[in-house]
Amino acid sequence: VTPEVFYSQALRNKKSLGAEPASISGRLGWWCFETTTPLTEGTYEAARGAVDTAMTAMQLVLDGEKSAYGLCRPPGHHATTSLYGGYCFFNNAAIVAHHVASTRGVKVVVLDVDYHHGNGTQEIFYDRDDVMYVSLHGDPARAYPYTIGYADEVGAGKGRGSNINIPFAARTGDDVYVNALADVMNKIHAFGAEMIVVSLGLDTFITDPICDMSVTTDGFRRCGELVKQLGLPAVVLQEGGYDVDKLGINVQSWLVGLGA
């Protein structure tokens, strides 16, 4: 089932949660922000399984592993505190980052390298100073989610300066992309994080069928190497990537760079 109507944030704020619509089609629009993410039989079990996968990877790292990779399906970075969408129901990376920051009292950085900006992760941590969000993505002037992900979105309140968006032009290739990631490493280091959570989207790949960037398999390896240089425990969680014939080798290349 999919929503038939959507409600603006202003309308949702004026109504109590107890006043959500009675019909299922209306309620879906209350909790969803777009049309590409239907609910089906088994959706909850799959989404909860993705969270469990992410939390298992997190626990492996907390128990002493240098890194762990979680093959999360469905992905999570578009899900906000109260809305699902963009194929995402629960924000796997945000759940891990919040859990570690709130229970261990340490700072965490979420590095999102998916082609699409993680609007949900940004919304969740936008006014917090214990979790930094860094996203490298297609320019939202042309790329989903369109209304968020611009470079001037830097965080609010005590979180100001802890949100970094790096949008790219179409056909951006390895050197420009990797250099941009290298440039932000000093800011990540200065933040003082004790763990990094990577939202690993591979839809920046040169032959991805629904995106328009030109990162190669070797470019992914170079990105992993940069993250390795931070020397932080790393939880790597799968987000997007739609050239399914190349997805495995691209994941492998990124993890080889990380030294996983």
Enumerate the predicted regions with their spans.
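HDAC/HDAC-like amidohydrolase catalytic core signature
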Residues: 1-260
